[in-house]
Amino acid sequence: MCILVREFNRKEEKYQNRWRIAFILCMVLGCLPKAVYFPMILSCLILGKEKFYSKKDAWIFKGIIVVVCFALLASFLLPVLSSPEQSSDTRGGDTNGASQLSYILKQPFAYVVVLGKNVIDTLQDSFMGPKALNSFAYLGDGKYSALCAAFLTGVALTDTYGDKQTKKKTLDISTRIAFLIVFIVTIVFIWTALYISFTEVAEEIIQGVQARYYLPFSFFVYLCIQNKNLKNTISLEKYQLCIMTISNAILFREIGQIVLVNKCL
């Protein structure tokens, strides 16, 4: 996805073959462990015609992307459809992939309500909560998640430097909307996968979804809130020094509390 952002920011350059291959390989390798992220590869379909050498070149590349996307989708769906029982995870309790899938197909509107409620209720924690920003795994969560969230949002809004390239470096409205649509579709697949494999049949609380599942695309959500009209007049060196100082201060404070105070004293 970083390769894709690079291409969006370099509108005057052509999308070179080496970067196309690198993008596809990275997406395929990244999706193999969890194929639910496959919709993210479709983000490159919104690249403008100016990024390609010809109209034919654009159609060929985007056709390859669609084929790869369907292949990743098949790797996700075929095991569930061919052997739903094998897709169940007993750690979720009395799960049954076949029965859960049947329930979704028979009660699609009921499932949409369940899905929407679970996503909305956990959205803030998934992007800005302790599990997303300052989790120390088995050691526990930090106490300054609100501060981390405010700091991260501030960086997203001020990371413009006020130079002549600011307007080129920020994403246009259509690109932001396309990114957000792709991310919403990805979120739907993440929750649906866990509903089928990790949640008991017809339960209204979907189990197993963790904040870390949002990490592959959370960075790009922050890119979508940047404002090209907001100028940062601080020099690059001073700005980066300020960011690193605040980041380390928060990190060391959390480590001191969680590791030294809670575990050593």
Residue map of PLM features:
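Juxtamembrane "helix-exit" motif on the non-cytosolic side of transmembrane helices
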Residues: 76-83, 160-166, 190-202, 253-265
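Membrane-interface helix-loop-helix junctions at transmembrane boundaries of multi-pass membrane enzymes
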Residues: 15, 52-61, 157-184
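Membrane-interface alpha helices of multi-pass inner-membrane proteins
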Residues: 18-35, 40-46
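Membrane-lumen/periplasm interface segments of specific transmembrane helices
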Residues: 35-163
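Membrane-interface transmembrane helices that cradle and orient dolichyl/undecaprenyl
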Residues: 1-18
